[in-house]
Every structure is written in structure tokens, then in C-alpha cells.
């Protein structure tokens, strides 16, 4: 909203400077974006009158003018096409200084002396008109300083309003705010009802009362739109960033800026029959005032006559029914359109107008009659004419209703952190036009006026009090609460610690979208029905993820495309399994790895990361809560993973995750030219462990046996280790696989596994007979169950 400071001060004028006013508005939530001077800096320019003109003897386009400043007559040479006797214009006399440090001196133009300069609006930086002189009103006082006459010691102030403050999209609304801020009186213009001098009306039918609960119309005959808009109105419009068009349009724009009620004037001769406010017919055509033809949709409210649509309600009028210089009779419209019926319609047709901007944010539903009378009075004063009666159609049941709000002083103190006196609370709210009635000590009933459709709750009133009292006056008080530290279960690992663990192992945390491309969903979860969004951001973000891998792999692609060859990322987040009925949202921890095992350095090679490197990272995560022994890795199958490099992770028989290399076909489809490894774990299982139990350290020596075993190639090392554990007895303290060999000297269908076993008794020394007997039992069981034998 852009407005003239002088216009505002005509309504309410607190005794403060412009800078202070601007700062106070911003602190009250009406953020000032810019302050622009109404004209450039100049001096010595007065209202002049052209007494006579003669053709320049040596220049076809120049005229020699005699110009009066009210006391003397001066000869001035001028080339403006609109210079003529009797014209009153800005006259820069000798010694004047115009914007840009341009000083007026006596000069000769083509041999003829010129004593001054006749000015255009552009030369004074008081408008854009540079195609001729700035024409002043016929009654302009000759000799008066032009800055005083036009009120150019003014500024245009632009405020950036939040969408809920549609009530401030007018000088009246801003004046109400300023009056409340400074406890200053607001002087509204006296708007009298205009008496009808003829009885012509056009019938009005509102066929969509929910969208248009109130519609007013009036016929005004015999207007003369050739009459110019008064300069004072043109200037107020200009300083509000509105271009002057003709008297009828200027007046409707002026009233909209002044009161906040959009209006529209139709050429009465172009209305067939009466007015119908209805929904458009699908595909109905309308050529708008800007010349654009639109194909209307059935959800668009239109103003129509008995044959065709005339305007998009609350947005823009039609070209064929618009007023022109030849219009003699007009039909003036003032209506209240429901916010929902207008919201988004302008944008859907590629439009944005001052009217739609206001209707989308809400217009005072009681304002239509006052705006109608104001516009009628201005039209009759400026263009002449004869007003008819106002026809009004109202659907009371569809008009907004605002319930009273209860305000408690205790709640004000609680939310703002200070005590505001009861009288001050009443004064501040009353200044905004609210009706405040005391119900009890420290409690009020507040009736909200029709222009404040954003107030419906007690907190809304408290916000208004904070704005008016001054945010900068509110005390700084930190929240006070009794915070008792929660006891964390020792057997529970928390996510921040898991994050730190992975970061310590060289990973970086990634955060990706929960919604992914349905095509990627199919690649990683083939055969699974995705949960699709009803209104996605874009087509490639239309499915909720069933795994964290798609987002991580996409982030991996992004890094690889930017020459980042070593990538190690992890993410924690939800996966979404199933449809809305029975949807399961499960916290997961996932990672993606590719590139070298270690960062590049002189002391370490560039060996590529492999399955077992990533498995070690996963084991570190699984062991974080102290329950690594409860997890097992078994060969598994996953449609997104390499069939020979996939591990299924189990805990007590429950599947809790997967680890493996991306399937070669999937890698090819995704353009990945190197091995990529991923893992994904159910976070709840990872974070749940067991408390460690202390066992007294044995003082007796350990006994170690190393066994080289031959097993079939398809026998997993974990199966061998499980059999060993089952038969090694209770004193086994350590078991590890330290070598795997396949090749020369070994049956091509077999492999060699070297394991180390360590026993230690807590209270005595173990002898060789005991260890040998246990070793024999292990070998016997391995041969019987896995066909694994001792290598000789």
C-alpha cells in the first residue's frame, strides 16, 4: 500500500516528524518499505500564467510567450506543444534552481531573449509527463510558490502489509492505526447521502449469494467524462502509484484508496437488461479492460447482464462495458465479495489488480454503502450528472458474523510479561474501533468491528495490545520453568550420539526430502505400491519414500557430478510403508559409501572401499548400545542390491536392516560407474541395547588355538563361527576369523578359513587335555553339520 503522507495527515496528524511516523508504523507491524519524495528538490518556481504567444521568427517549433508571475510580465521562449494563452503552468524564474542543480539564467534562444522557463512535471520530478507543460487548474493563484500550491513538500510512503491486515489497504485504515498509536483524533470526511433526482434503476439478481452477499448499484445519467480530473486528485493518485485515466476511473480508484472499497463503473448503454451476479459458464469468453481475452471457468464469479459476462467479480471489468470519453450514463457498482470466491482467481488468469488484492485479503462488508455515496458525490462534483436511487441486494445469512471475544488481564500479563493498566487496555483497543465492555474486574467483552476480520481469539487482542503499547517497551524476560533432567536409560543409545559416531568414522550427515520421484521409488522398491501425494510440489516429488536410499543415492550422484570421488553420507529419517489405511512411519538410519577406503595421503593407498569396510561401520553402529552379539549377518536378497554382496541383518530372528552393494543393473540405470555400497537399519533396534555386566578379570593364563578349516565355498563364515561357539564351551573368551583363502592348493569348490580361539578359566589354569577335547568336539561338529574339515 502506497499513500501520500499529506493525505494521511488530512485524516490524522500527530505532532511528529516523518521519520518518527515511519519508524512507529514499522514497529507497529506496518513495515515501511520505502519513502519517496513527491517531487525533486527545487526552488523559485511559482504559478505562472501565459498571457500571449507568438511564433518564434527563426524556429518553427518555438513560441515567444509573455508570462505573468502576478507582479511582472516576462518574455519566455518555449517549445512545448501545449503552450497557449490563458494556460497556468509552473514558471521557473531567473535564479530558480531545478532538480539536478540546474540553475535558470537569462538566455537567448535563436536570437530571442528568454527570461525563465516553463516547466513540465518531469522537469520538476513531480510526475512522468514530459511531452508538454504541466497544466495547472484555471483557478490556480498566479505567483504562489508551486510547492505550496501542489503540496509538493510531501512523500509517498509504501508499507508492506501482511495478508491479514487488509483493513490497512486504505488511508482510512492507516489513519485509524496512526490515531490509535498516538491517541490522536481521526477526522473522516463528511459523506452525505446523495438524493436521487430520477428513478431509473437496473434490476439486480444475485444468483450466487454465498459469493456475493451484498451488491449495490446506481444509475448516474448525463456525466461529462471529457472534464479533466482535478489536479489535487491526480496528485494523490500519483503519489499512491496509481495512473490517472479519466474522471470516472480516477474517482473509483480514489475512493478505493481512501476507504478501502473497490468500485467499478460500467457504461450503462452496454448493459442489456439488468445485472446478474452469477458463476461463469465453463468456457465463457470475456475480453478484459487490458485487451486480454480469457476463457472463464465455472468456479469464477462474474458480473453479467442478461446476455453476457461484463466483468470478473472483484478482479477486472470487461472491455466492451468499460467507460470511455463518449460515455454519457454509467452504472456504478459497490459490492462485497466473499474472500474465498475471489481468492486465487486473479492469479489463475494471470492477473493482479488493486481490487483483487483487497478482496483476497478481506474488505469491510459494511463499507459498500458509504463508498457508493462518496463516489457518487465526487462524480457529480467533477463530471456533473444526475444520480438515481441506490438498489441494494443483501443476503443477511451469508454476511460474515464476528463473535465477541473475551479478554483477561491475567492472560495479557502472562503473554506479554508486564501489567498494563485496565484503563490503558480499554483506551488502546477502543482506538482501533473495538467496543470494549467490562464484564468483571480484569475481564472484558470485546466486540470486533467489521473491518477487523483478523481478530477472533483472545491472543489476537493481546497481539494488538503489544503492537500499540510498543514491542520495544515490552520487558525482556526469559522463560522460567522447572526443568528436571530426565533419566536416560543406559541401555538406550540416542540419535545424536549415533550421528557423532558415524561422523567420527568419516561420514557426513545428509538431509533429503521425504517425497521422491515415483520412478526412483520403483527402482529401489519394485512391486511395492507407493503412497502418492494428492498435491505434490512437482511430478518428481510425488511419492513418499519407503527407503532412505533413493535420497542418499541422488545426493551421491550430485557429489560425483562435482568431482567428489570419495563420498560417505548417512541420514536418519522416516520411511513410509503402506497406504493411508495402516500407514507405518518408521525411523531409519541409512548410509551410502563409494570411493577409496581412506582419504588420499602419502602414507596410505587408494584402495577402494569394499563390502567388509562398510560392514565394519555397520557393526560399530550395532555395537553402540552394547548389543552387537544379538545381531547376525546372513546372505540375503534385495531387489536393489547385488545378489552376491547382500547381507540381511537380523536380531533374534527379526529383520532389522540390509547391507550391500547397489545392483549392477540399477547402477547402470542411474549412471553410476563405480561400486556403491549402502546400508539401512531400523533405528529403534539399533538404539536398544543391554547393560554391560562386570566380570572379574581372570588372573590365569589364556590358551589359544588356531584352526585352518576347509569348507565348501557356499558355506558362510558366520555359519562356521556359530558352530564353533556352540561347541567351544563357557570359557571361550575370543573367537575371530583372521584369514580366508581360495586358490592354489585348494579344491576349487572349497575355501580355507583360519580362525583363532582363545579360552581362559576364571579360577584356574586350563590344561591341554581340556582344550584338546573341546577342539576335537568343535571339529567333529563342523564336519557333521557343515562338511568343514581341518586343513592338513
UniProtKB/Swiss-Prot annotation:
<feature type="binding site">
    <location>
        <position position="464"/>
    </location>
    <ligand>
        <name>Mg(2+)</name>
    </ligand>
</feature>
<feature type="domain" description="B5">
    <location>
        <begin position="400"/>
        <end position="476"/>
    </location>
</feature>
<dbReference type="GO" id="GO:0009328">
    <property type="term" value="C:phenylalanine-tRNA ligase complex"/>
</dbReference>
<feature type="domain" description="FDX-ACB">
    <location>
        <begin position="698"/>
        <end position="791"/>
    </location>
</feature>
<keyword id="KW-0460">Magnesium</keyword>
<dbReference type="InterPro" id="IPR020825">
    <property type="entry name" value="Phe-tRNA_synthase-like_B3/B4"/>
</dbReference>
<dbReference type="Pfam" id="PF01588">
    <property type="entry name" value="tRNA_bind"/>
</dbReference>
<comment type="similarity">
    <text>Belongs to the phenylalanyl-tRNA synthetase beta subunit family. Type 1 subfamily.</text>
</comment>
<keyword id="KW-0820">tRNA-binding</keyword>
<dbReference type="GO" id="GO:0006432">
    <property type="term" value="P:phenylalanyl-tRNA aminoacylation"/>
</dbReference>
<keyword id="KW-0030">Aminoacyl-tRNA synthetase</keyword>
<dbReference type="InterPro" id="IPR005121">
    <property type="entry name" value="Fdx_antiC-bd"/>
</dbReference>
<dbReference type="GO" id="GO:0004826">
    <property type="term" value="F:phenylalanine-tRNA ligase activity"/>
</dbReference>
<dbReference type="InterPro" id="IPR045864">
    <property type="entry name" value="aa-tRNA-synth_II/BPL/LPL"/>
</dbReference>
<dbReference type="InterPro" id="IPR002547">
    <property type="entry name" value="tRNA-bd_dom"/>
</dbReference>
<dbReference type="Pfam" id="PF03484">
    <property type="entry name" value="B5"/>
</dbReference>
<dbReference type="InterPro" id="IPR041616">
    <property type="entry name" value="PheRS_beta_core"/>
</dbReference>
<dbReference type="InterPro" id="IPR004532">
    <property type="entry name" value="Phe-tRNA-ligase_IIc_bsu_bact"/>
</dbReference>
<keyword id="KW-0963">Cytoplasm</keyword>
<feature type="binding site">
    <location>
        <position position="463"/>
    </location>
    <ligand>
        <name>Mg(2+)</name>
    </ligand>
</feature>
<keyword id="KW-0479">Metal-binding</keyword>
<dbReference type="InterPro" id="IPR033714">
    <property type="entry name" value="tRNA_bind_bactPheRS"/>
</dbReference>
<dbReference type="GO" id="GO:0005524">
    <property type="term" value="F:ATP binding"/>
</dbReference>
<dbReference type="GO" id="GO:0000287">
    <property type="term" value="F:magnesium ion binding"/>
</dbReference>
<protein>
    <recommendedName>
        <fullName>Phenylalanine--tRNA ligase beta subunit</fullName>
        <ecNumber>6.1.1.20</ecNumber>
    </recommendedName>
</protein>
<keyword id="KW-0547">Nucleotide-binding</keyword>
<dbReference type="Pfam" id="PF03483">
    <property type="entry name" value="B3_4"/>
</dbReference>
<dbReference type="Pfam" id="PF17759">
    <property type="entry name" value="tRNA_synthFbeta"/>
</dbReference>
<keyword id="KW-0067">ATP-binding</keyword>
<dbReference type="InterPro" id="IPR005147">
    <property type="entry name" value="tRNA_synthase_B5-dom"/>
</dbReference>
<feature type="binding site">
    <location>
        <position position="454"/>
    </location>
    <ligand>
        <name>Mg(2+)</name>
    </ligand>
</feature>
<dbReference type="Pfam" id="PF03147">
    <property type="entry name" value="FDX-ACB"/>
</dbReference>
<dbReference type="InterPro" id="IPR045060">
    <property type="entry name" value="Phe-tRNA-ligase_IIc_bsu"/>
</dbReference>
<dbReference type="InterPro" id="IPR012340">
    <property type="entry name" value="NA-bd_OB-fold"/>
</dbReference>
<dbReference type="InterPro" id="IPR005146">
    <property type="entry name" value="B3/B4_tRNA-bd"/>
</dbReference>
<dbReference type="InterPro" id="IPR036690">
    <property type="entry name" value="Fdx_antiC-bd_sf"/>
</dbReference>
<dbReference type="GO" id="GO:0000049">
    <property type="term" value="F:tRNA binding"/>
</dbReference>
<feature type="binding site">
    <location>
        <position position="460"/>
    </location>
    <ligand>
        <name>Mg(2+)</name>
    </ligand>
</feature>
<dbReference type="InterPro" id="IPR009061">
    <property type="entry name" value="DNA-bd_dom_put_sf"/>
</dbReference>
<keyword id="KW-0648">Protein biosynthesis</keyword>
<keyword id="KW-0436">Ligase</keyword>
<feature type="domain" description="tRNA-binding">
    <location>
        <begin position="39"/>
        <end position="147"/>
    </location>
</feature>
Amino acid at each position: 500500500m502506497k499513500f501520500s503522507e499529506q493525505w494521511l495527515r488530512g485524516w490524522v496528524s500527530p505532532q511528529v516528524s516523518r521519520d518518527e511516523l515511519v519508524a512507529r508504523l514499522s514497529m507497529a507491524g506496518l513495515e515501511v518499505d520505502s519513502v519517496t519524495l513527491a517531487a525533486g528538490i527545487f526552488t523559485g518556481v511559482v504559478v505562472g500564467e501565459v498571457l500571449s504567444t507568438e511564433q518564434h521568427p527563426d524556429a518553427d517549433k518555438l513560441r515567444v510567450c509573455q508570462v505573468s508571475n502576478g507582479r511582472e510580465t516576462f518574455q519566455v521562449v518555449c517549445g512545448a506543444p501545449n503552450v497557449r494563452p490563458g494556460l497556468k503552468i509552473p514558471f521557473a524564474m531567473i535564479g530558480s534552481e531545478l532538480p539536478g542543480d540546474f540553475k535558470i539564467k537569462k538566455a537567448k534562444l535563436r536570437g530571442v531573449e528568454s527570461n525563465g522557463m516553463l516547466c513540465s512535471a518531469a522537469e520538476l520530478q513531480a510526475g512522468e509527463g514530459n511531452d508538454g507543460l504541466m497544466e495547472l487548474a484555471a483557478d490556480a493563484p498566479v505567483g504562489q510558490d508551486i510547492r505550496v500550491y501542489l503540496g509538493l513538500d510531501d512523500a509517498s510512503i509504501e508499507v508492506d502489509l501482511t495478508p491479514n491486515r487488509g483493513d490497512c489497504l486504505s488511508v482510512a485504515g492507516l489513519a485509524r492505526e496512526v490515531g490509535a498509536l498516538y491517541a490522536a483524533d481521526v477526522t473522516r470526511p463528511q459523506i452525505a447521502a446523495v438524493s436521487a433526482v430520477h428513478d431509473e434503476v437496473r434490476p439486480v439478481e444475485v444468483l450466487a449469494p454465498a459469493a456475493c452477499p451484498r451488491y449495490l448499484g446506481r444509475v448516474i445519467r448525463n456525466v461529462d467524462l471529457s472534464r479533466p480530473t482535478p489536479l489535487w486528485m491526480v496528485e494523490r493518485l500519483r503519489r499512491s502509484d496509481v495512473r490517472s485515466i479519466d474522471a470516472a476511473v480516477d474517482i473509483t480508484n480514489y475512493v478505493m484508496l481512501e476507504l478501502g472499497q473497490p468500485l467499478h463503473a460500467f457504461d450503462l448503454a452496454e448493459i442489456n437488461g439488468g445485472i446478474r451476479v452469477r458463476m461463469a459458464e465453463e468456457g465463457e469468453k470475456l475480453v478484459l479492460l487490458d485487451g486480454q481475452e480469457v476463457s472463464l471457468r465455472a468456479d469464477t464469479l462474474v458480473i453479467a447482464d442478461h446476455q453476457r459476462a461484463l466483468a470478473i467479480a472483484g478482479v477486472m471489468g470487461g472491455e466492451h462495458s468499460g467507460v470511455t470519453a463518449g460515455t454519457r450514463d454509467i452504472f456504478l457498482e459497490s459490492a462485497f465479495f466473499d474472500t474465498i470466491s475471489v481468492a486465487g482467481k486473479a492469479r489463475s488468469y494471470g492477473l493482479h489488480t488493486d481490487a483483487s488484492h483487497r478482496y483476497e485479503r478481506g474488505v469491510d462488508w459494511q463499507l459498500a454503502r458509504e463508498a457508493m455515496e462518496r463516489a457518487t458525490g465526487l462524480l457529480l462534483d467533477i463530471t456533473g450528472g444526475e444520480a438515481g436511487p441506490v438498489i441494494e441486494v443483501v443476503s443477511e445469512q451469508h454476511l460474515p458474523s464476528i463473535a465477541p471475544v473475551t479478554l483477561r488481564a491475567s492472560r495479557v500479563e502472562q503473554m506479554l510479561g508486564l501489567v498494563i493498566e485496565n484503563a490503558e487496555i480499554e483506551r488502546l483497543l477502543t482506538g482501533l474501533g473495538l467496543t470494549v465492555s467490562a464484564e468483571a474486574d480484569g475481564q472484558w467483552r470485546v466486540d470486533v468491528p467489521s473491518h477487523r476480520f483478523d481478530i477472533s481469539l483472545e491472543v489476537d487482542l493481546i497481539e494488538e495490545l503489544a503492537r500499540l503499547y510498543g514491542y520495544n517497551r515490552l520487558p525482556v524476560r526469559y522463560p522460567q520453568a522447572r526443568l528436571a533432567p530426565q533419566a536416560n536409560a543406559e541401555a538406550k543409545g540416542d540419535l545424536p550420539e549415533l550421528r557423532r559416531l558415524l561422523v567420527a568414522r568419516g561420514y557426513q550427515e545428509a538431509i533429503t526430502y521425504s517425497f521422491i520421484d515415483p520412478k526412483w521409488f520403483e527402482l529401489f522398491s519394485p512391486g511395492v505400491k507407493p503412497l502418492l501425494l494428492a498435491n505434490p510440489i512437482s511430478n518428481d516429488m510425488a511419492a513418499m519414500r519407503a527407503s532412505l536410499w533413493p535420497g542418499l543415492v541422488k545426493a551421491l550422484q550430485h557429489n560425483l557430478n562435482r568431482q567428489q570421488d570419495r563420498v560417505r553420507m548417512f541420514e536418519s529419517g522416516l520411511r513410509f510403508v503402506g497406504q493411508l489405511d495402516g500407514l507405518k512411519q518408521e525411523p531409519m538410519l541409512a548410509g551410502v559409501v563409494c570411493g577409496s577406503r581412506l582419504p588420499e595421503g602419502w602414507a596410505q593407498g587408494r584402495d577402494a572401499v569394499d563390502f567388509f569396510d562398510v560392514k565394519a561401520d555397520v557393526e560399530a553402529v550395532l555395537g553402540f548400545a552394547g548389543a552387537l552379539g544379538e545381531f547376525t549377518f546372513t546372505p540375503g536378497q534385495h531387489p536393489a542390491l547385488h545378489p552376491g554382496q547382500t547381507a540381511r541383518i537380523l536380531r533374534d530372528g527379526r529383520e532389522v536392516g540390509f547391507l550391500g552393494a547397489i545392483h549392477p543393473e540399477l547402477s547402470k540405470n542411474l549412471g553410476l560407474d563405480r561400486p556403491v555400497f549402502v546400508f539401512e537399519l531400523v533405528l529403534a533396534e539399533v538404539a536398544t541395547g543391554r547393560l554391560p555386566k562386570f566380570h572379574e578379570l581372570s588372573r590365569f593364563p589364556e590358551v589359544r588355538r588356531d584352526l585352518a578349516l576347509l569348507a565348501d565355498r557356499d558355506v558362510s563364515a558366520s555359519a562356521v563361527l556359530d558352530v564353533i561357539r556352540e561347541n567351544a564351551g563357557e570359557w571361550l573368551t575370543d573367537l575371530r576369523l583372521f584369514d580366508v583363502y581360495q586358490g592354489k592348493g585348494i579344491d576349487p569348490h572349497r575355501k580355507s578359513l583360519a580362525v583363532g580361539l582363545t579360552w581362559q578359566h576364571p579360577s584356574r589354569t586350563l590344561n591341554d587335555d581340556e582344550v584338546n577335547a573341546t577342539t576335537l568336539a568343535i571339529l567333529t561338529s563342523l564336519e557333521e553339520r557343515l562338511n568343514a574339515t581341518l586343513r592338513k
